[in-house]
């Protein structure tokens, strides 16, 4: 049935005003309007592009400008479309197959977390991601030494996401924030000392601190401060308990 015939029937049954309302609707414009009218309709509902036969490049570009996620509705989007989509919504890269270097960079520069959507990212992309957000390293498989170092520089606490961190990384982390030692397994005496040097209270996060570390902490504490005195007494108590335990074993 032709459009003219449909129009005639609707007017006959429902009246002229009913047809006018249909013509005014954005759905009608999506199906029958000019390119300008269709674009205007798509601005209201980007997903309506699914109902347009052979949408133009201009239409495709317009919908990703409105909603980056709409890139998933477009087959083989151009790089310009990809960039517009990621500019509007950085995580839209999730829906882009084999994004270019420029698209990847733009996405991770907006949010390092988006590296989780990039397959086999280069070291360059990894570095940009952790610079934007150190925690992005948790989404990187087998990060290089350079990437690990950059991530810890930007956020020392991300060391907890790094498998078997080197002594160099541990030292870099605790030199920025002593409390990071809580996330380091079996820290060496050198790492413990650096943590306490940065923040004496971080000794509370160290399991079995060495005598040298305890002595360093006590020297740093203000003995006249009641809070500090409690810390010192606790160390003495723990030390005595450990000695008693060892004697009992003998």
Residue positions per predicted region:
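Alpha-helical scaffold segments
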Residues: 2-250
């Amino acid at each position: 049935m032709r459009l003219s015939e449909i129009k005639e029937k609707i007017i006959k049954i429902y009246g002229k005003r009913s047809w006018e309302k249909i013509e005014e609707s954005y759905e009608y414009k999506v199906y029958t309007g000019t390119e300008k009218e269709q674009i205007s309709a798509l601005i209201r509902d980007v997903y309506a592009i699914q109902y347009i036969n052979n949408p133009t490049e201009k239409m495709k570009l317009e919908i990703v400008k409105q909603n980056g996620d709409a890139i998933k509705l477009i087959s083989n989007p151009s790089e310009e479309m990809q960039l517009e989509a990621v500019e509007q919504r950085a995580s839209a890269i999730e829906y882009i197959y084999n994004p270019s270097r420029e698209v990847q960079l733009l996405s991770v520069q907006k949010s390092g977390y988006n590296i989780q959507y990039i397959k086999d990212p280069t070291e360059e992309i990894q570095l940009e991601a952790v610079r934007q957000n150190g925690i992005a390293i948790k989404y990187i498989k087998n990060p290089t030494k350079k990437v690990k170092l950059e991530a810890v520089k930007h956020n020392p606490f991300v060391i907890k996401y790094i498998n078997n961190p080197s002594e160099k990384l541990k030292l870099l982390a605790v030199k920025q924030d002593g409390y990071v030692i809580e996330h380091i397994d079996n820290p060496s005496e050198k790492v413990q000392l650096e943590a306490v040097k940065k923040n004496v209270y971080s000794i509370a996060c160290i399991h079995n601190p060495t005598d040298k570390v305890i002595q360093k902490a006590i020297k740093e504490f203000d003995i006249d401060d009641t809070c500090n005195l409690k810390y010192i007494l606790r160390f003495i108590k723990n030390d005595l308990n450990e000695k008693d335990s060892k004697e009992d074993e003998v």
